[in-house]
Amino acid sequence: MLSVPASSRIDFAGSPRPTVGVEWEFALVDAHTRDLSNEAATVIAEIGETPHVHKELLRNTVEVVTGICENTGEAMADLHDTLQVVRRIVRDRGMELFCAGTHPFANWSTQQLTDAPRYAELIKRTQWWGRQMLIWGVHVHVGISSAHKVMPIISSLLNQYPHLLALSASSPYWDGSDTGYASNRAMMFQQLPTAGLPFQFQSWPEFERFVHDQKKTGIIDHMNEIRWDIRPSPHLGTVEIRVFDGVSNIAELGSLVALTHCLVVDLDRRLDAGEQLPVMPPWHVQENKWRAARYGLDAEIILDADSNERLVTEDLDDLLTRLQPVARSLDCADELAGVAEIYRHGASYQRQRRVAEEHDGDLLAVVDALVAELEL
């Protein structure tokens, strides 16, 4: 493989400890109509300068962000404190906070773009598909000590991609219709030219070469334009997991963050022990993403390079048992145990469909139910 010029080398900050951070996207909905409200700029202006609340592509969205946290409990407490402030301001303006992978009935054509050069450039390039990005998600950062670990961890973590997506799937509806998918968001987001599954590089120089080529050919100008579902975040010294659909409540989010933290730290420790991390062929990884997006917790997933298959919930049972010692060491055993409650009582996409069925297909009731789940 060709080496990259010294000017194209990418420094990875590195994290001395396996810290965790969370970015949680929320839509603003009108308290009466339950449709989206393009008032994020006024909400953010009233909150004032803070690293904990960010603007996003669309003016109907605010993103709540933690600081650098030692464990899941600390991250959830951080989010809780910020959300109390944000929700008070939002409610004072006649709106509510809403989180799911998609809004059940909102139409993309009425949504306003946030005024920022990078968003304008995104839409200029991606056109219709870019304007369709009426989606919300959760991003989890986990600290990694050294660049040489990053790509092996990302490539191996793809084996658990369908588990993470199926558990968080919350976007069955699009523009008033049931799509038949558990996560329509996952299918939508990958239409952007630099989004979707990451390439399964095994070394940092391979990633550096990729970024060099992307910049040289004008595909990207900045690192943050690589919008992979799992990607390195060199300036933070983290791996950023962007698989999740939007999550409607803190308890469920805590379980998903704990699972993510444990998975990454487990892979990190196995690397330290000299293990070669397992990977699957990219065609299996791609198929698993589709199966999880389509069938959610009913997906039968591919487990390994030998093409063995298993129901995702059965594999989750064993995975949670295996990760218990890691969870205890990360002080998130209780949150990890909550993962099983998601598939025992129903993921968000299943709950949404139940509400719609109980209300004769009324999607306003679905929005009501999702808003009510955010208990602070």
Swiss-Prot record:
Main EC class the enzyme belongs to: ligase
The protein, known as: Putative glutamate--cysteine ligase 2-1
Biological process (GO), any one: modified amino acid biosynthetic process
General function of this protein: ATP-dependent carboxylate-amine ligase which exhibits weak glutamate--cysteine ligase activity.
One GO molecular-function entry: ATP binding
Superkingdom to which the source organism belongs: Bacteria
NCBIfam families attached to this UniProt entry: gshA_cyan_rel, PRK13517.1-2, PRK13517.1-3, PRK13517.1-4
EC number: 6.3.2.2
Catalytic activity: L-cysteine + L-glutamate + ATP = gamma-L-glutamyl-L-cysteine + ADP + phosphate + H(+)
Key words of the record: ATP-binding, Ligase, Nucleotide-binding
Gene3D superfamilies linked to this entry: 3.30.590.20
SUPFAM superfamilies on file: Glutamine synthetase/guanido kinase (SSF55931)
The family this protein is said to belong to: Belongs to the glutamate--cysteine ligase type 2 family. YbdK subfamily.
A Pfam family this chain is assigned to: GCS2
